[in-house]
Amino acid sequence: MTRFPLRRAERAMPRDEALAVLDAAEFAIVSTVDDDGMPYGVPLSFVRRGDTLYFHATNEGGHKTVDFRRDDRVCATAVTGVEAFFEDGDFSTSFRSAITFGRVREVVEATEFKHALVDLCMKYVPEAKRSIGKAMEKEGPHTSVWAIDIEEISGKAHPGPRGDASGDGRTDAADDGGCAGTDAGRQTDPVAGAYPVAALGGEGA
């Protein structure tokens, strides 16, 4: 892959801040290339754990999963803190963005599969954690989980007139390996990390 230097080098972000953008983002655009060379990008809800991004799909498959199985190279892009402004006679936009490159794979190991779905639910609907187990029992057989193992990541930020391009403020998520806002109800698993016991149908469910 050809790499180009960042034109505005002063806007580059360190790795931990780029990861924080991923954690704060509501969705990412995951891009592939069709078998005829046409680029294809699809917005997906996702969650990060460490250097891996997880998202789900149906077992029926579709455009993106056909591309995944043909070529596992993908790019995922996320943006937060977007705000247009006019200052000193110029129009501009504040933002924080992250671009990742990696390899996509289908998650087939049971523990990783379960934890990925729990983390996704806890990112987007943490208030419903006690219902996750039942939902997984119902929808799990019809669901596939995919993972992007990050090989490269870069970030870029343009502060607005207030000097702030931090998105929604969840920038501390990178410190705990992702899954922002999912600490409540966790129990540590020495193999696969932390997860809400109640969501898996264990004690307290």
Model-based region annotation:
Residues 15, 20-26, 34-35, 52, ...:
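Hydrophobic/basic alpha-helical segments enriched in Actinobacteria
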Residues 108-205:
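C-terminal edge-of-domain segments
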Residues 25-60, 76-77, 86-90:
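Short beta-strand segments
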Residues 19, 65, 88-90, 135-138:
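A generic local secondary-structure boundary/capping motif
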Residues 60-119:
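Short, structured beta-strand-loop surface elements
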Residues 52, 73, 103, 152-154:
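Structural motif
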Residues 1-29:
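Short, basic/aromatic recognition patches
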Residues 29-34, 86-88, 104-109, 130-136:
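Short helix-to-loop capping/linker segments positioned immediately adjacent to catalytic or ligand/cofactor-binding
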